[in-house]
Amino acid sequence: MIKSKNITILGTGISGLGSAKLANKLGLNVFVSDNNIIGEKIKKYLNENKIDFEENGHDIRRLLSADQVIISPGISFVDLKKRYPEINKEKFISEIEFASRFTNAYLIAVTGSNGKTTTASLIYHILKSSGFNVGLAGNIGVSFAESVCNFSYDFYGLEVS
């Protein structure tokens, strides 16, 4: 489980938004930060759910005061560290690590250069056709965190980078 209450999420793509939804559902204090402009649909969701956010940059004070920082896969920790040398790597986790703390499902994660989507989909279909309660998530449409937020599966086929 998670020891912290103050969660900062970097990025508002599929992974970041899914993490925000899960953290919010868990009753954590969520702050979302994006280096770019946040789309209106996402802003609407964040506002409706009373999730604080910032766009066009990351406030170093938020990074330092967070108990845990969930970093989207498209954000380089190395680049963040160069820009903000005072940040602590120990606080940073991926969306996959975050979501995995809140499910008891078996995870079958597929990574590599080629064939990830096909392999993850095949795993899902084999398990599903065998009668298992299985979900398919990751870089395949729905984020793992959002799936954990909305469903309870016994197995996951995950496409990860």
Outline where the language-model segments fall:
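N-terminal leader/targeting and accessory segments in enzymes
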Residues: 1-94, 98
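Phosphate-binding loop of NTP-binding sites
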Residues: 5, 25, 60-64, 73, ...
